[in-house]
Amino acid sequence: MARYRCCLTHSGSRCRRRRRRRCRRRRRRFGRRRRRRVCCRRYTVIRCTRQ
């Protein structure tokens, strides 16, 4: 199974696997407003990238 680098997307469950720890820290800044759309500023993509 491929690993996904981003945390966000529409089909979140399987994408939210990787980079969870790092995202949790940055997520606090955006609050609940952008939480769904952005996880990590670096990985702001609409689809997950396979590694």
Swiss-Prot record:
It is found in: Nucleus; Chromosome. Phosphorylated by SRPK1. The keyword Ubl conjugation does not apply. GO terms for molecular function: DNA binding. PROSITE patterns: PROTAMINE_P1 (PS00048). GO terms for cellular component: nucleosome; nucleus. It holds the Pfam family Protamine_P1. One of its GO terms (biological process) is chromosome condensation. Keywords: Chromosome, Developmental protein, Differentiation, Disulfide bond, DNA condensation, DNA-binding, Nucleosome core, Nucleus, Phosphoprotein, Spermatogenesis. Testis. It comes from the Eukaryota. Disulfide bonds join 7-15, 40-48. Belongs to the protamine P1 family. Cross-linked by interchain disulfide bonds around the DNA-helix. Protamines substitute for histones in the chromatin of sperm during the haploid phase of spermatogenesis. They compact sperm DNA into a highly condensed, stable and inactive complex. This is Sperm protamine P1.
